[in-house]
Amino acid sequence: MGFKDKILFWKDEVQYRTLAVADQVANRFLHSFENVYQGDESVEDADSRPVGLTNETLSHSSDFFVLPEERISTRVKIRRQNILNTTLILGMLIALVIWTAILSTNSYFSSSLASASPLFNKEGRVVRPMRESNLGLHADPQTRKSSKTLYDLLSDFDNAFYDDENMILGSLAFGENTYSRQPYVANGYIGSRIPNIGFGYALDTLNLYADAPGALNNGWPLRNRRFAGSFVSDFYSLQAKLNSTNFPELDEKGYTTVISSIPEWTDLQFTVDLNGTKWFNPQSVLIDDVINYNQNLSMKDGIVSTNMDWLNGMINIKSEVWAHRKIHSLGITRLEISLNLDALPDEFTELPVTVYDIIDLNTSHRTTLYEKGQDEDNKAIYMIVNPDNVPYSNAVVYSTCTIKGTENNFSPYNFTSDDRIARNYMTNLTEENPKVVIYKYTSVVSSEYNNDEPNPNVNLKFASNIANTAKGNYKSLLSNHKRAWYDLYNDAFIEIPSDSLLEMTARSSLFHLLANTRQYNVSTTRGLPVGVGGLSSDSYGGMVFWDADVWMAPALLPFFPNIAMNMNNYRNATHQQAIENAKQYNYPGAVYPWTSGRYANCTSTGPCIDYEYHINVDIALASFSIYMNGAEGADEDYLRFTTWPMVKDAAVFFKAYVKYNETLGEYETYNLTDPDEFANHVNNGAFTNAGIKTLLKWATDIGTHLGEEVDPKWMEIADNIHIPRSDSNITLEYSGMNSSVEIKQADVTLMVYPLGYINDESILNNAIKDLYYYSERQSASGPAMTYPVFVAAAASLLNHGSSSQSYLYKSVLPYLRSPFAQFSEQSDDNFLTNGLTQPAFPFLTANGGFLQSILFGLTGLRYSYEVTPRTKKISRLLKFDPVKLPLLPGGIAIRNFKYMGQVLDIIIDDNNGTIAHKGGDKPIRIKVPNRDILHDRNITSALYSKRDDDLSATDDYYGTYFTLYPNEELVIPLYDTKLNIDGNIAESKQITNLTAGVPGDVGFSALDGNNYTHWQPFDKSDNAKLLIDLGFNSTHVIKKGIILWGQRPAKNISLSVLPHSERIEQLFANITDLLETSSITKGGLPLNQMLGQTQSNVTAEIDDDILALLNWKGDDLDQLIPYLPDMHLLQEKFIPILKDYPIKPNQRYYEEIIDDDIIKLLPSNTTEFTIDYNSIPGGEKRARYVVLTVHGTYDDDDDLKGATIREIVLQE
């Protein structure tokens, strides 16, 4: 068969492989001649295809040396225009043999792929023309419907709701003001947290978890009372002392900069004259006076809407608040006050209403009044404030109002105090004129926004122009605002069709990050500082931590690279101060402080020395990753003038900082703190030392690429820096770590991700053991950025199970707060039980981490580069290593992923991973790693000897290269992860806990094929139940099983099954259809009619487990329950097939582990059981639904928590 013929792999594998080999040879020769005559141009700079290749030529050069056959797309067709005869094929095969011999004997050519010349890269394309029909995802609606029960596991979801279709989050309960129940509006420049009534300023008056002194306070370092207030970006004050700080002695060396809040820009209030004057503001409205309440946040457009009836339902109040997405300094409030005519008393005649437009200094924090006044010409008010101790910075708040249908009749109003300014409007509501609508247009302009303009009068004029131009144009402004949000989402979208909660979390995370950042109107001399709490909170003083560099910016980079660049430009703008910091401590180079604000000086909250040195690696990583992404502007000039100075000066500093230990023959670090802040001032922090090693390699590669001077000492240190390890080859978090350690947050695991995603040194020799070991030692109340790291690490390291997805659920369920899908920093918000930690809120770090767990974790995408040995030039590429996602049937889709200035769709369905090149005019290079080199089994300590090298960028780590051209798609079969235990029919199936688990635990961990994750009952005195669904049309006869307990086995277990019935399958199929297509409350068909049932109207008691199953599969089955008792199907019961089976531990207590501080993985207690069906009544043995009941713990100790269920194994 000749090249002209279309050859399908599945029809003739031998011919396919022969032609693929010949095709590679031909293309390698073509590339060889091109490189000889045209020079070494990387694909990213090439404007045309290689000579001899056309759009009709599908050049397949999969790496036949190392790529597993199952990774080759069975749908790829090879088309050739040229008719080549058999002689040419044989000639090429002979040439291939000779060529291979040359490569294998020449050490220059056989170097690792991470540094191989493009001339000899296994480069080519396994692609096809892009097919839009293949870019959609499909998922079982029953699975998605079942996923909605996960919302019930979120904190405070009782009176919350989510409108999936319209992306609206909401609350139906009016209560006291508390931070976690409040939405906010923001546009990347201004923001305001919205109190219960929908506008205005409010101090918190309720803590949901504790009533104790300090319960209403925010956390370190301000420890002030939480409040719903307004903020403007980069408006930092200077504070000589703070309420709480780690290193107060450093206050003598320089003040700390923390964010100032500004006078509340949504502040409207009104009074009604009804048996006396009654005020409508957040301080005065009583809970008992409000009915029919709802407050909504639309993630589609960032508008907060509030609606309620007040004073016995007599008055309806509606409000809308939004920060204009394009006109960054403009905030708008719409207030509608109307009579409910049906609720008016018989004697009603009129209701006097007075509306106040107010700007109040008392609603700001850490500010000084500069000026306030009335602008009579424009019937407006304004106030100018300075942040504390910064007289050369100011912010103007300028407000003007209009009344719908009338002239602006607001008049000046004089308060008795000098720190407020107001105008008011009086009207009477009657049955003939029952409504008044007020529009408040507020402009906020700060010096930092207006080109660092220090003159307040200039900023006042700017603010006046914005507000008065906007006045009277509400509809057009609203349309423009919504369009701006629509355009943002048109650039970025994530789909998870099988799981409503995860998809909502992805979309809300994207919303929260976008709401607190902006693409333009950012000072090039300042950049964009983004605090942990964004623009609606002063958590952590609004200061900038590594959270911005490692967690937030990388999540935005694939969608909005210009925002990531703006954030990194803040570090560039403060780089000179980092140089001064190093000089202050007699070091060369530059060193950044742990916290930054208006300045980047060393402070009591943010030391530069003897603390978290990894911040310097984090900042360099963020900048280098922008270059790796290759967006517009992230070019060679960006690398030379932005990234290189940061990387170089960090390398110079670290060269001076490390100390050589002659006994070890390695370089060490001293008196530092790693990301795990439970362990302060330790030596040889693993993440810090690995970061130094990696950064020094970056410095060498970048400097050589740019032709800059490179210090050879950098690589000497990189090759010989000490990474502490135990005798069992587990990476120690720091030298001297003991076996009783509790880890605050992800630390050692960060060495895999994100530290490894820039280059090919992403697989640590002992990373798998590290992942297992440290997953058991995370603090139950640790911060919310921990488990997204485990998602990425598990996806890239483990070839068994589905724990990357169970970790994904652990990233959400303990931390996400209803009703407005905001992350808390902690899994436990009760400061009396979590170690006196008041959580940051909202915690944008978690939003960034969660997005990264999807963008880079589940997809296996990594930015990477290679260095050509001959030219020493860097060539950028994208690594793609997707695996099957059994817990997410239907897969995930990432729309409009930006890379090298091109636009991609990333699709992971049930069988294939697809990268579709749908925008741009340049090809991109993609590398698919070979997962067969991973070994995540047989990792007992005896198998590995202690090694000196820590990062395995060995010559054995190969992959396959593809070139993807515009309007083409790369399709590769997903890596099919293996079963953890052979024959386990329950692994990676759907599961739900019917009883409470320990906060932070998820039921998926018991079926994820990872023996080092677990689910644990909250109370060991109760019968804990887990309900397992073995899958649609998947029934089994369970004959035996195994339970892995870890170190805390149960006292006994029971196992029950629901005998299989085709009618039961039909029941759930029709319930799903009914819930998706009709509504019982709207007169839809009764369920028994849908099923064709004609049972007598006899009510029977429903088995509790049946009811739990129905609620799991139906979500809102409470609507259907009145119809269900008539059906005999619901009289079915779960049948016990194993009852009160006693548990006996089979592993001893390893006392020496504690006594001798031995760091190693311990074997798990296991229980094996068999099922004797001879003693079980009933004929049907097959089942789809299984309930595992776990009671007590084997040890009678004081710990109230139940047994740890690491893995459930069911076998036929």
Curated annotation (Swiss-Prot):
Residues where substrate binds: 546-547, 744-745
Compartment(s) of residence: Secreted; Periplasm; Membrane
The Gene Ontology biological process annotation of the record reads: carbon utilization; trehalose catabolic process; trehalose transport
For this UniProt entry, what's an example GO CC term? periplasmic space
The record's annotation in InterPro entries points to: 6-hairpin_glycosidase_sf, 6hp_glycosidase-like_sf, Gal_mutarotase_sf_dom, Glyco_hydro_65_C, Glyco_hydro_65_M, Glyco_hydro_65_N, Glyco_hydro_65_N_sf
The residues on the Periplasmic side of the membrane are 104-1212
Report TM segments.
83-103
So what EC number does this one have? 3.2.1.28
Bilayer topology term: Single-pass type II membrane protein
Q: Which residues lie on this side of the membrane: Cytoplasmic?
A: 1-82
What is the protein's known function? Periplasmic/secreted acid trehalase that catalyzes hydrolysis of the disaccharide trehalose and required for growth on trehalose as carbon source. Growth on trehalose is not restricted to respiration.
- So what family is this one in? Belongs to the glycosyl hydrolase 65 family.
Q: What is this protein called?
A: Periplasmic/secreted acid trehalase ATH1
Q: Which gene encodes it?
A: ATH1
